[in-house]
């Protein structure tokens, strides 16, 4: 390579010439010799990248460049390398699309060449094996002994000649005229019969002529015409003339006698049978019955045929009695021999009786011979004959299939005749995703895998014992680690980081096995097959042939959702193991004690084995080897038995499935649901609850939900089947499956709940759970030594007040929070860096590295930040000299702030980027407990107190709230994120701009301060003392309305249901993202422990975490920083509340049709119209729409506590007294909330209903109703009879009611009443009173003339579409969101701009999603079915 010439590693590299030619010219011999091992004869891309800017400099070059080479490596990966002056260093791969495409094609060509070479070698090997087998075949044929020809003895010749001569004597058979019966005078009997017939012959003839019909006359004419005109020499007559030669029995018998003497294995018996068949006159009819006989029954038949020669009737009688006597006297024989003998005797009886009938009627046995021969031919033609041979290898796998030469034409004809018929259906299309498949390559072989979630799923036998396997995707090779293998034949691999953007297959929520699809890669080709599947326990079977490489392939339904993982086949049927969501999570490892016990047992087994081996004689080794071989043979036999057992099970299931309709016992009507679980179809299922509807307004529905919705609509078109209420009711299920009438749970019971997954409480009968003796549990110390406390822990212990250590028996160690690197921009969404990011322990090294050397600064740094850099450098030098670094955080903060405002990178970020080596981003690791947990004191509800520090500067807490302290937390307090969704570029430009007054929420510290205003409007009075009569009336109305809550129960904490994908609050949120991660790490043990602690009398103070809600609101509120706050408590505290109130909440959701609370209510399927009609049916003249302001925050604490007490009075009496102190502690923490803000400040809230507690909506409903009852009595007096005509529906602060009377100045008086008495805010204009319900709104819908819902704020919906606060993942989600808006706009005017715009957008997105399975739009009929219900459920 000459100096200055471009360097090329190979001819393909020169031909493609990817990258920069200038970079190729910079290559030196040293750089060439140290090049990484790229694929031979492959191109590379050369780049000359600028490393940095040098200013000022004495030279002419301001830029420092480095050569970067990108290409495919020999290990199948794709990488980039930069030369640092000494060697090539790997960097993050640079994407060159042309290079990647070329490498993919080259890799495929190399793979095809390798396959061709291997195929040629295999072909040569197989040709050599064929030659060897041919030689072996010839040698074995020579070794086969040839049978010696049987010698013909003279005695058989003489015997055959004599019998043939006797048989061929004329008249030598039973029906010759010279033969008579011995016991019966046949001539006399026939003469008597003839005389009897000739009597009155003339009379008989006259009667016959008198009864001649027209058909008889026509038949006579036809016979005369045939006789006159049909030619005598017709070819049919010639054929029938020569056919009678088949009756030339004598010649045929002579030929059979010669053949019998020459070839028969029993010539004596066969010759006697020929002679007796001639003697009896049965002749040819005897021959087809011979295969049915044994030797004994053959001689019985010969004897009876000889008897038939002498006396016909005696022979027939004996023949009929022979099977009967044989059944009795031959019963001592074994089954097979017994059946053969009886079959021969029955054949003899049929021959003798049938032959006599034929001889008597026709004079010949030809008809009997034809019948027996036809039956044998049909039996032979319809018998199943193997159509192919299957060649298997040593493992039992089918290698090849060879068709047999014998083709049963009749069998195929009858089979095709059964299967033929008029086509009654068409095959369905199936959805496949080839991009979600990959090839798993291991040293043992190849298999197929597929992407699902964060894993690659394949069969466990494909992975084998390997810890790491190669994953081939689109020609590139990646390495993946085996994450988890459950007990099933399934393996889960960790998905490499570069493969995260690939397509994913989802698990089927509603499995449908009627049509399954198997997708796999075989020899780098995609193969697809569909078939019907049957379920056998945890496995599937289907008629699909398996080829090498298909193991681990996904078995999907017609929608492309995964049902099972393909395994292998055992012949005709393919097999797969069903995959469940629970299979993705590994079972929690056994505890340390269990591991130690297993280790002890293993050591004992080894010790016993060593003792036995020591006494074993060496000479026994050969027998051991033989035993080893016998064990291996038995394993093979067991394998074959297992395969046959599986095939027989599959065959039984298929036969039972086919015969089920015929075996079902019908007694006049169909039994619906008896003995099985099913859904109440007449009552229907709610499509959308109110919570789901509110979520629909913001996010829309995903693709799977829409497809299920459409399937539901199609299924409803035929109506719902009838059912009996008695069949649907299950006596064992009382509607509340977790708790019986007399069951109580004792939380003092010591139970091990250290499982990885939440489990339901045990289903018990009416028995009380007896607690075990209380034992003080001690932590197991496996380290056997006490570690020295860190300085941080000692400081925390010293600073802890004595009153904070309330629980002496629970020795806890303070947790040292995880210390993360300062992140000035990553968590502040573009605002100024958080102060705490810079306030860490500075030292001399930090000070030196915060500013680079002068020659490392860019020209832009000097121009924009020159003065500030000089100032900071002076501060750094002073800090190093004085060892006082207190001024550094503020100085660095100001410098980074100026850099950010000028568009430059912050200096603290530069230090992080420099010190952090480039890493290849991989999959996110699962959350787990920290290593330095100590005594795991973050489990307790008041663990936050141990971490509480003195208060600092107020930033987010208003001045009228106390500042209790500061907690270390790393959360943002700025958010100006307004995402820009590129998918919205597909939508047309809107002409209606009313949506622009809405937008996604953004905030700063002022928004947190502003959010506390929700608790203040006016101070309430002591209304219980001022208005006792009205409060008593409101209590009566509340008890009356919610009387269905009477005798509700407290449930076990492990039986509670809660959203586990929520933050676990502080301090658990430092280690776990969600409660689900916390449960996976620790199970239910902390929950039980804390409940027991409260039950015993402790009263820990719970910490709530506050954050602002990201949603679509008016831009005016965003400018005023008027953002709603949400608080959430520790999940243990929330689940304790669920123990006390979950049963009541569930009952409230079940009574939405008759009660006021509408939590769990669905406006779909006629639900909205039914609710509105319920208010109209009251017959009142007045309808009121009521809209509160700051409802949650202004609820008086006295009223909120009173409602909680009313709810508690509904609890079962025994449990009410038992858990009263737990309930009081729970309510006290609701009313006095210690709240943590993202700034680390801790304050105290004593007002309102917290928005994140377990029963927020339910409590708001009851407060709303109590206030309405108070309001009614305030204006109308406590008139209970008049109150019964009042009705209302509420959802939180939403209220729509009907009343019999309203005062004239109702709006002014009601606003004044709520302000002066309760301190609650109702703005003027928010109380609408009309004489018709039309035009009023409830839950975001306005009622139209047909009592149907119309969106109240379509401009807000349009803003959530065009100005979302969260980017949609793909185009399908955008189309699904538009379908949701089309559904919501079903009853809007056709020319409404929102509805027109949605239709226009659907036409745009539908063109891009023709193959997605989503509908282009919902039809009018579908929209009405969703809103109004099915044919038997239509409400309007």
From Swiss-Prot:
List of residues that carry O-(5'-phospho-RNA)-tyrosine: 693
Sites annotated Cleavage: 175-176, 419-420, 664-665, 755-756, 933-934
Region of interest (Disordered), residue spans: 756-828, 913-934
GO molecular function, one term: serine-type endopeptidase activity
Stored SUPFAM superfamilies: DNA/RNA polymerases (SSF56672), Trypsin-like serine proteases (SSF50494)
Coiled coil: 104-142, 587-620
Active site: 461, 489, 551
Every RdRp catalytic domain range: 1181-1307
Family note: Belongs to the astroviridae polyprotein 1AB family.
Protein name according to UniProt: Non-structural polyprotein 1AB
Biological source species: Human astrovirus-1
């Amino acid at each position: 390579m000459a100096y200055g010439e471009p360097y090329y590693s190979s001819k393909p590299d020169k031909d493609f010439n990817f990258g920069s030619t200038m970079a190729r010219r910079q290559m030196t011999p040293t750089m060439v010799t140290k090049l990484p091992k790229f694929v031979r004869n492959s191109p590379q891309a050369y780049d000359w990248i600028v490393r940095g800017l040098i200013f000022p400099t004495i030279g002419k070059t301001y830029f420092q460049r480095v050569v970067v080479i990108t290409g495919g490596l020999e290990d199948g990966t794709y990488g980039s390398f930069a030369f640092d002056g000494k060697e090539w260093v790997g960097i993050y791969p640079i994407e060159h699309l042309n290079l990647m495409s070329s490498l993919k094609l080259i890799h495929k060509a190399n793979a095809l060449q390798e396959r061709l070479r291997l195929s040629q070698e295999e072909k040569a090997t197989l040709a050599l094996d064929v030659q060897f087998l041919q030689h072996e075949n010839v040698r074995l044929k020579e070794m086969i002994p040839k049978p010696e020809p049987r010698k013909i003895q003279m005695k058989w010749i003489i015997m055959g000649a004599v019998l043939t001569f006797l048989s061929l004597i004329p008249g030598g058979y039973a029906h010759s005229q010279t033969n008579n019966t011995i016991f019966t005078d046949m001539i006399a009997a026939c003469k008597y019969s003839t005389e009897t017939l000739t009597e009155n012959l003339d009379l008989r003839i006259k009667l016959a002529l008198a009864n001649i019909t027209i058909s008889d006359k026509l038949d006579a004419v036809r016979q005369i015409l045939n006789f006159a005109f049909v030619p005598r020499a017709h070819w049919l007559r010639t054929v029938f003339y020569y056919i009678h030669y088949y009756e030339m029995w004598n010649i045929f018998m002579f030929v059979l006698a010669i053949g019998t003497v020459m070839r028969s294995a029993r010539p004596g018996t066969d010759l006697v049978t020929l002679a007796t068949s001639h003697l009896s006159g049965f002749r040819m009819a005897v021959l087809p019955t011979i295969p049915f006989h044994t030797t004994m029954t053959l001689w019985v038949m010969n004897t009876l045929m000889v008897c038939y020669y002498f006396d016909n009737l005696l022979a027939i009688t004996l023949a009929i009695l022979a099977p009967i006597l044989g059944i009795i006297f031959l019963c001592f024989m074994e089954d097979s021999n017994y059946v053969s003998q009886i079959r021969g005797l029955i054949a003899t009886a049929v021959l003798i009786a049938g032959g006599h009938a034929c001889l008597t009627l026709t004079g010949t046995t030809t008809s009997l011979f034809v019948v027996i021969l036809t039956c044998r031919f049909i039996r032979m033609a319809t018998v199943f004959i193997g159509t192919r041979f299957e060649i298997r290898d040593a493992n039992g796998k089918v290698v090849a299939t060879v068709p047999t030469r014998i083709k049963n034409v009749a069998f195929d004809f009858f089979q095709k005749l059964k299967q033929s018929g008029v086509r009654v259906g068409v095959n369905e299309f199936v959805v496949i995703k080839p991009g979600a498949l990959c090839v798993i390559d291991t040293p043992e072989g190849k298999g197929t895998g597929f992407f699902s979630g964060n894993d690659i799923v394949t069969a466990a036998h494909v992975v084998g014992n390997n810890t790491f396997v190669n994953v081939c995707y689109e020609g590139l090779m990646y390495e993946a680690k085996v994450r988890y293998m459950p007990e099933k034949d399934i393996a889960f691999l960790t998905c490499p980081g570069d493969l995260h953007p690939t397509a994913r297959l989802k698990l089927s929520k509603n499995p449908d096995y009627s049509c399954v699809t198997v997708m796999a890669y075989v020899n780098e080709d995609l193969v697809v097959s569909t078939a019907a599947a049957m379920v056998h326990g945890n496995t599937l079977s289907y008629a699909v042939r398996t080829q090498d490489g298909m193991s681990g392939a996904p078995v999907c339904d017609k929608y492309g959702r995964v049902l099972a993982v393909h395994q292998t086949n055992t012949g005709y049927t393919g097999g797969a193991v069903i995959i469940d969501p629970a299979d993705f999570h590994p079972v929690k490892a056994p505890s340390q004690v269990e591991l130690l016990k297993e280790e002890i047992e293993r050591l004992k087994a080894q010790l016993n084995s060593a003792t036995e081996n020591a006494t074993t004689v060496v000479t026994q080794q050969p027998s051991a080897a033989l035993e080893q071989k016998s064990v291996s043979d038995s394993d093979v036999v067991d394998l074959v038995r297992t395969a046959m057992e599986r095939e027989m099970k599959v065959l039984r299931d298929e036969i039972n499935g086919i015969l089920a309709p015929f075996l079902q016992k019908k007694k006049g009507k169909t039994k619906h649901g008896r003995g099985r679980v099913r859904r109440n179809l007449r009552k229907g299922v709610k499509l959308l609850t109110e919570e789901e509807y509110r979520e629909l307004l913001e996010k829309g529905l995903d693709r799977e939900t829409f497809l299920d919705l459409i399937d539901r609509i199609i299924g409803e078109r035929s109506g719902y089947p009838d059912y009996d209420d008695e069949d649907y009711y299950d006596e064992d299920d009382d509607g509340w499956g977790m708790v019986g009438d007399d069951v109580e749970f004792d939380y003092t019971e010591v139970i091990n709940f250290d499982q990885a997954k939440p489990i339901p409480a045990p289903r018990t009968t009416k028995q009380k759970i007896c607690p075990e003796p209380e034992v003080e549990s001690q932590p197991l110390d496996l380290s056997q030594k006490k570690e020295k406390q860190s300085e941080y822990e000692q400081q925390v212990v010293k600073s802890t007040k004595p009153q904070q250590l309330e629980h002496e028996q629970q020795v806890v160690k303070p947790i040292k929070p995880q210390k993360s690197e300062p992140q000035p921009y990553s968590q502040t969404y573009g605002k100024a860096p958080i102060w705490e990011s810079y306030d860490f322990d500075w030292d001399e090294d930090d000070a030196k590295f915060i500013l680079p050397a002068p020659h490392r600064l860019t020209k832009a740094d000097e121009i924009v930040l020159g003065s500030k850099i000089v100032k900071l450098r002076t501060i750094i030098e002073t800090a190093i000299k004085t060892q006082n670094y207190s001024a550094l955080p503020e100085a660095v903060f100001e410098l980074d702030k100026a850099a950010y405002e000028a568009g430059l990178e912050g200096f603290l970020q530069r230090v992080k980027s420099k010190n952090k080596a480039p890493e290849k981003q991989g999959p996110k690791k699962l959350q787990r407990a920290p290593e330095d947990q100590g005594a795991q004191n973050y489990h307790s509800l008041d663990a936050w107190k141990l971490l509480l520090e003195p208060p600092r500067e107020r930033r987010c807490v208003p001045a009228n709230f106390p500042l209790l302290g500061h907690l270390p937390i790393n959360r943002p307090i700025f958010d100006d994120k307004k995402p820009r969704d590129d998918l919205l570029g597909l939508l047309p430009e809107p002409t209606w701009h009313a949506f622009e007054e809405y937008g996604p929420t953004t905030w700063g510290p002022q928004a947190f301060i502003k959010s506390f205003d929700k608790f203040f409007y006016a101070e309430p009075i002591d209304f219980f003392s001022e208005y006792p009569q009205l409060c008593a009336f409101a209590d009566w109305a509340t008890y009356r309305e919610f009387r269905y809550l009477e005798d509700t129960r407290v449930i076990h904490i492990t039986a509670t249901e809660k959203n586990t994908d929520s933050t676990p609050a502080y301090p658990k949120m430092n280690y776990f993202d969600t409660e689900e991660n916390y449960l996976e790490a620790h199970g239910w043990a902390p929950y039980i422990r804390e409940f027991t602690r409260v039950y015993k009398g402790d009263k820990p103070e719970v910490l709530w975490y506050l954050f602002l809600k990201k949603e679509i609101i008016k831009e005016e509120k965003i400018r005023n920083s008027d953002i709603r706050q949400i608080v959430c408590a520790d999940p243990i505290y929330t689940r304790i509340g669920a123990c006390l109130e979950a049963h009541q909440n569930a009952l409230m959701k079940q009574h939405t049709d008759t009660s006021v609370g509408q939590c769990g209510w669905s406006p779909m399927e006629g639900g909205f119209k039914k609710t509105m009609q319920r208010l109209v049916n009251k017959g009142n003249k007045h309808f009121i729409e009521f809209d509160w302001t700051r409802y949650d925050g202004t609820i008086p604490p006295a009223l909120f506590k009173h409602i909680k007490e009313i709810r508690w009075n509904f609890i079962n009496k025994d449990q009410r007294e038992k858990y009263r102190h737990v309930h009081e502690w729970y309510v006290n923490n609701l009313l006095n909330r210690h709240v943590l803000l993202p700034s680390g400040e801790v304050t105290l809230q004593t007002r309102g209903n917290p928005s994140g507690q377990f029963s927020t909506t339910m409590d708001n409903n009851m407060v709303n109703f109590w206030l309405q009852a108070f309001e009614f009595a305030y204006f109308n007096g406590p008139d209970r009879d008049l109150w019964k005509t009042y009705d209302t529906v509420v959802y939180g602060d939403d209220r729509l009611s009907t009343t019999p009377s309203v005062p004239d100045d109702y709006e002014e008086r009601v606003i004044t009443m709520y302000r002066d008495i309760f301190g609650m805010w109702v703005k003027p204009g928010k109380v609408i009173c009309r004489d018709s319900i039309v035009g009023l709104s409830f839950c975001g819908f306005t009622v139209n003339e047909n009592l149907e819902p119309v969106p109240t704020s379509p401009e807000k919906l349009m803003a959530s579409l065009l100005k979302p606060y969260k980017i949609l993942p793909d185009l399908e989600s955008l189309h699904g969101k538009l379908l949701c808006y089309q559904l919501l706009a079903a009853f809007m005017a056709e020319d409404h701009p929102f509805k027109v715009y949605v239709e226009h957008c659907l036409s745009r997105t539908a063109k891009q999603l023709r193959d997605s399975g989503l509908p282009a739009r919902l039809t009018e009929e579908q929209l009405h079915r969703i809103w109004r219900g099915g044919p038997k459920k239509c409400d309007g």
